[in-house]
């Protein structure tokens, strides 16, 4: 059994802990601002690491593609241009004809002249 002095010491220590903790027996529900900021920074850091890892894998795939001796097609002028003149000309069967609704809209625009 504990003596009265030991019991008093334990009670004083428990009272000091409760007084200094100031939780009033309730669980602490709020997080401090610094803890929230730390969690936010950790999330941003993890997403940044994921992006870097994804980019590293893609660059490794490109490097492997070139290392395997795959032929790289070089373009003249860097843009895709039609090779024949006929590719530039619109075929009349593919041209859009004005429907009745389009003609009505054009008539309204012609009649509403700005002053």
Swiss-Prot record:
PROSITE patterns: PARATHYROID
Region Important for receptor binding, annotated ranges: 51-69
Residue ranges annotated as propeptide in the record: 26-31
Gene Ontology molecular function terms on file: hormone activity; parathyroid hormone receptor binding; peptide hormone receptor binding; type 1 parathyroid hormone receptor binding
Keyword Secreted tagged: yes
Domain of life per record: Eukaryota
Compartments where found: Secreted
One Pfam family it belongs to: Parathyroid
Range of residues in the leader sequence: 1-25
GO CC annotation, single: extracellular space
Alphabetized UniProt keyword annotations: Cleavage on pair of basic residues, Hormone, Secreted, Signal
Known partners and oligomeric status: Interacts with PTH1R (via N-terminal extracellular domain).
Family of this protein: Belongs to the parathyroid hormone family.
Full protein name: Parathyroid hormone
Annotated organism of origin: Sus scrofa (Pig)
Gene this protein is translated from: PTH
């Amino acid at each position: 059994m504990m003596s009265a002095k030991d019991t008093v010491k334990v009670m004083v220590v428990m009272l000091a802990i409760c007084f200094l903790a100031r939780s009033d027996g309730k669980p602490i529900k709020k997080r401090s601002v610094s803890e929230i900021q730390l969690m936010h920074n950790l999330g941003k850091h993890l997403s940044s690491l994921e992006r870097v890892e994804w980019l590293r894998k893609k660059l490794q795939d490109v490097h492997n593609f070139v290392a395997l001796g795959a032929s790289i097609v070089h373009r003249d002028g860097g843009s895709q241009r039609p090779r024949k003149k006929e590719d530039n000309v619109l075929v009349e069967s593919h041209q859009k004809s004005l429907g009745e609704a389009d003609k009505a809209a054009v008539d309204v625009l012609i009649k509403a002249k700005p002053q």
